[in-house]
Amino acid sequence: MSDHRQLRVRFYPTQGQWMCVVQRLGADGMPEGEDAVSAVGATKEAARDAAIASTTDQAVIEALRAH
C-alpha cells in the first residue's frame, strides 16, 4: 500500500456541481506545484469517481478511495 499522507483531497462546491482536487504536499504541509488531479461531478461521489478515472497514479487513487 502506498503512503498517501502527503496528498490532500478536497471537495469544493462550484456552479451547482462538486470539484474534487488532490494536491501534493511538501514537508511543510503546503501544496507543491500543480494539482495532482482535479475533476467535476454532480455529487462528491461522482467527482471522486471522475478523478479516479482520470489518473493512473496509485497513491492518488488510494487517497481518493480513502475519502
Where are these regions (language model features)?
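Short intrinsically disordered terminal tails
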Residues: M1-S2, A63-H67
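Short N-terminal "domain-start" leader segments
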Residues: M1-V21
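Positively charged, low-complexity intrinsically disordered regions
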Residues: Q6-V9, R24-L25, D49, A66
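A short, exposed loop/beta-hairpin motif centered on an aromatic-Gly-Thr core
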Residues: L25-D49
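Short arginine-rich
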Residues: I52-R65
